[in-house]
Amino acid sequence: MKTNYSALDISSFFIKKGVNPLKLQKLLYYSQLWFFVKNDSKLFNDGIQAWIYGPVVYDVWANFKFMKRGSIIPIGRAVNLTLDNLTINHLDDVWRSYGHLSGSDLVDLTHNDLPWKNSRKGLLSNQPSDKEVIINKDTTRYFTLDSNNKIPVIKTQNTLGHYSNF
């Protein structure tokens, strides 16, 4: 099992599915979080920051900051990298659980997650931050796999709805 991927490496999987930069950031966060829950290790080495609209991997943001918020990232921006089977299966599971949600739905979900909330403690809701989102046994204790050892599928109505116009 290779675990020294970069977040940009992992991004290519989701870019090939057709995502905008906002949705990509949240899928990276959930990929890292659930990989930790399943394997007690990180999927990629990059840190995740607690930005106003949820978790962000800075290097991935810098790569796609030129794009309009809702624009789908061109598939040509995906790198051709062979991921191991464990990683592919994991990313398929993340996509099955979260891929049907919009970027704004995912923003809402992340704002309710303990790792992001803990990282934003003491900050105003509109205050920029580069604090790291900590993913560990304490912050992921409420994330549980279903009876088939899969990530539960998230329903749209489970989101808070605050960023639906985002």
What residue ranges belong to the model's regions?
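Domain-edge interaction signal
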Residues: 1-166
